[in-house]
Amino acid sequence: MATTNITIPARSASGPEGKHAPARMKFYVDTKRCIECGGCEVACKNENNVPSGIARIRVVTVNEGKPGETNVAVPCMHCSNAPCVSVCPVDALFHRADGIVHVNKDTCIGCGYCLYACPFGAPQFPKGSPYGKRGVMDKCTYCAGGPEEPFSATEQELSGSNRIAEGKLPMCASVCSTKALVAGDAEEVSNVVRARSAARGSAAGSWGWGTAYPNN
C-alpha cells in the first residue's frame, strides 16, 4: 500500500470534458504532518512561474501559539462536485475527464462567483495582468496545465506546467518532505487516507477530504 506522496502514475485523461466528472485524481492534506516549511508554496511558484501576489497553494496556521495549533496546506482540492463549476455563469470552469478542474481564461469574465462558492478559497483574481489576463481567475491547476494546447507557449503562459501529461505528480506533493501532501490516482490516495486514519484511530488530520470528496 502506498504510504508516501508518490502514488501510482496518473491516469491519462480519456473521454469527453464536461461540467462534472468523477474525481480520479485527488489531493490529501494531512494536517498532522504539515510543519509549515513553505516548501510547497515555493515549489509551486517556481514550477508554474506564478507571479508575485498569486498563491496557488498557501499554508495557513490555525490557532497559532495556542494549544491545538494546526498547519494546513490549502490548494484547490479539485472537488468531485465542485461548486465553482456549478456556479460559473459562462462555463469557464469545467472538469477534465480525469476530474481535474480547469479554467478557460479566454472565457472567464472575472465575476467572482466561484470564489464565493469555493469552500477552500482557491480562486484568485489578480488586479494586475499576470498571464496577460487582467482580473481573470487563477488557481491551482494540479500541475496539469490548462485547456490550451499541451506544452505550448500559450499553456505555459496562461496555466503553467503540465506535469500530469508527463506522468508526474503535482510539484507541491512531490517536494513535501513530511508527506503531508499526497496526490495522484484517487484509489491510491484514498488508501493512504484510510491507512493513516486507521493508525490514528480516527480521521483527524484529513482536512477538507469529506468536503471535496463526500462519497469517499
Model-derived segments and their meaning:
Residues 1-216:
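Non-ligating segments of multi-cofactor redox enzymes
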